[in-house]
């Protein structure tokens, strides 16, 4: 069986953010403070049309022998897929206190109010409204070991509205939780070369988890998970190795599990690495060449309800190599060529109840002009 559909819609978004920042003296030391506020509004309206069959399913025969051709089915009339009016306003403040020459304390808080008026998926005659608000404090302590090295610890509260729906077509409650982080940072040669190493732990409730089942409208059904814990480590190195040669390297490793020890979001890689470099030719300074590789480990999804019952879709670890060259024709005008997926690696960019192939080898050329 195959699944298809037409979608159309529009999104309009407006946002404003304003803040004041300044310094002040207290107890003979210089400190900093900031106050601000923001408001955003987003309006979405989407319709869809499907083949006139159950959930848009069309018989394509044996998919192993299918060549991609199929007769144009009878399409259903356009109907409402989703219609939302989302407003979010916030007020925030932060301060950086100099406790001693090497020691700084950072304190802050944000108040957020989130309001959404929407139609449950596939229910054009039902209008719902939900308003949530929360205060999210954060704090950090930074200690300068010497001119090059510093260490820090931080705490942040989490309040994150979601755009996923449950089986009734209602939006899930915002994700809430706490985040803890500690690390070291260093910079050398007047910040020409920087590096950082951090460990983190994130505790969350109301985390959206895809059930890989669908509403009659075709929209995915999600459920909320409580007691989700993510913990891991990050490393990054950025800088200029010479006047003409720049390098970036980063690596992340983490695990995420629910309160029962089950993997959460297993369709996202647990280990990632990136290496990117660029070089400006000394004999032809207008030309810059570079490239890099992005690598990730295996991802998978367990799906219920298939012809064979429970099944697993997975993508093994892989790396993608990309190249670029940029020529500065004039001070304002430049031309750039990009080669993505240099070795034409075949891979799945998404794994779930279906899979989506990643982009094959492709080349693009662009021009830019700075005024």
Can you annotate each of these PLM segments?
Residues 28, 102-105, 147-151, 190-195, ...:
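Repeated loop/turn-to-beta-strand initiation elements of outer-membrane beta-barrel proteins
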Residues 101, 201, 223-304, 343-346:
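Gram-negative outer-membrane beta-barrel transporters
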Residues 2-119:
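Face-selective signature of the C-terminal outer-membrane beta-barrel domain
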Residues 144, 151-152, 175-240, 247-252:
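Membrane-embedded beta-barrel scaffold of Gram-negative outer-membrane proteins
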Residues 22-25, 97-98, 133, 141-144, ...:
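Residue-level signature of outer-membrane beta-barrel architecture
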Residues 9, 33, 180, 266-371:
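Conserved C-terminal beta-signal and adjacent last beta-strands/turns
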